[in-house]
Amino acid sequence: MAHVIDGKAIAQSVREELRMEVERLKLNHQLTPGLAVVLVGADPASQVYVRNKKRACETAGIASFSHELAATTSQAELLALIEQLNQDDAVHGILVQLPLPKHIDEQKVLEAISPSKDADGFHPYNVGRLVTGDPTFQPCTPWGVMEMLKVSGVDPKGKHAVVIGRSNIVGKPVALMLLAAHATVTICHSRTPDLAETVKRADIVVAAVGRANMVPGSWIKKGAVVIDVGINRGEDGKLCGDVDYASCFEHASAITPVPGGVGPMTIAMLLKNTVEGAKRAHNIA
């Protein structure tokens, strides 16, 4: 029987710590951290994410600047807005909600964000610093995964961690973070031969592939820790992760649920990046 790693509770604790830290920054330094969120178009899922981020900012005492643009907004107009936010001293974190409309080059947009305001941790400069192990904005979801392991008392040192998925948003950065925590890391993907055998040797499994219930319990070594980053709709229309929760629960020593696992951590770490950005901008330790 697995211990359930409660992402909601851990995220709530992170957000409460941040709320107190923001209060101190306001009191001692007259500084209010600010996050600008840019949404292009009216994608319903993106609108929900943006609303959640705004609400989370308000609860933590962080200033929230929302920029909702029409789907017809040109790339040049979007880049001009980002440059304006780069120059705005009240903004310490900038997040452009993905996906963007097809006529806009996502990579160009992400690279236009100042590395010192890159709240999502996606800028190539910050990714490079992650590779070299230097202090940087960390990608929110992988950082949330690492925080969950830490709070749950799981030390990756000396353990075999298998990451399923090689995206720039989760797979690659979480592998780098696990490596920095002294785990032996294997990255698996759609071309990996005999995926099941590789996963069976893992002490820690991070599933981030976007395929509903892809990992069955028979792949999980007795006592392994399972972190499910996937968020999918199952055949029954219900939200589910990349791992088959019920069967993996029987084998794992600890597991994250979907929903209520990694998801809440992503927003908590986004707020943490914003507060860190404000402190760095004002040389506050």
From Swiss-Prot:
Query: Where on this chain does NADP(+) bind?
Result: G165, R166, S167, S190, I231
Q: Does the keyword Hydrolase apply?
A: yes
What is the annotated role of this protein in its UniProt record? Catalyzes the oxidation of 5,10-methylenetetrahydrofolate to 5,10-methenyltetrahydrofolate and then the hydrolysis of 5,10-methenyltetrahydrofolate to 10-formyltetrahydrofolate.
Spell out the subunit comment. Answer: Homodimer.
Ordered alphabetically, the record's keywords are:
Amino-acid biosynthesis, Histidine biosynthesis, Hydrolase, Methionine biosynthesis, Multifunctional enzyme, NADP, One-carbon metabolism, Oxidoreductase, Purine biosynthesis
Tell me which positions the record assigns to the signal sequence. Answer: none
Task: Please list the GO biological process terms of this entry.
Answer: L-histidine biosynthetic process; methionine biosynthetic process; purine nucleotide biosynthetic process; tetrahydrofolate interconversion
Database matches in HAMAP family: THF_DHG_CYH
Gene Ontology CC entries for this record: cytosol
Entry similarity comment? Belongs to the tetrahydrofolate dehydrogenase/cyclohydrolase family.
Where does this protein act, in terms of pathway? One-carbon metabolism; tetrahydrofolate interconversion
Q: List the disulfide bonds.
A: none
Q: Which domain of life is it from?
A: Bacteria
The name on file for this protein is Bifunctional protein FolD
Oxidoreductase keyword on record: yes
Q: Matching CDD domains, A to Z?
A: NAD_bind_m-THF_DH_Cyclohyd
Q: Which InterPro entries match?
A: Aminoacid_DH-like_N_sf, NAD(P)-bd_dom_sf, THF_DH/CycHdrlase, THF_DH/CycHdrlase_cat_dom, THF_DH/CycHdrlase_CS, THF_DH/CycHdrlase_NAD-bd_dom
Q: Which gene encodes it?
A: folD
Q: Which NCBIfam families match?
A: PRK10792.1, PRK14186.1, PRK14188.1, PRK14189.1
Documented EC number(s):
1.5.1.5, 3.5.4.9
Query: Example GO molecular function term?
Result: methylenetetrahydrofolate dehydrogenase (NADP+) activity
The residue stretches assigned to a coiled coil in this entry are: none
